[in-house]
Amino acid sequence: MFGKGGLGNLMKQAQQMQERMQKMQEEIAQLEVTGEAGAGLIKVTINGAHNCRRIDIDPSLMEDDKEMLEDLIAAAFNDAVRRAEEMQKEKMASVTAGMSLPPGFKMPF
């Protein structure tokens, strides 16, 4: 199935990809992404590991309905998570560029 050098080359490629993925995952965990809701009145900043780093609430919202404020915070957090996931996909795509992976192959991230 594999030639003499084919399997060794495949294993070497897999090891290199694993090392690059590990490095990229460490870099991604350090990056920060900000999600917004309410036209920027609520901002939630998370890191690449989806840990919340900061929540900014415009002072004008402090007088408003508590339930609306909670909804906006949740929406901003969800927006931040979506942006973080998009960033992760872009960064990890650079790791696998040039590799002959089968169509539809899902990376473990």
From Swiss-Prot:
| GO terms under cellular component | bacterial nucleoid; cytosol
Q: Which GO terms describe its molecular function?
A: DNA binding
* Localization, UniProt: Cytoplasm, Nucleoid
Key word DNA-binding present in the record? Answer: yes
- Please report a single Pfam family linked to this protein: YbaB_DNA_bd
> Could you say which protein family the record assigns here?
Belongs to the YbaB/EbfC family.
Q: How does it assemble?
A: Homodimer.
Xref: PANTHER family: NUCLEOID-ASSOCIATED PROTEIN YBAB
Task of the protein: Binds to DNA and alters its conformation. May be involved in regulation of gene expression, nucleoid organization and DNA protection.
Stated name of the protein? Nucleoid-associated protein HSM_0308
Organism of origin: Histophilus somni (strain 2336) (Haemophilus somnus)
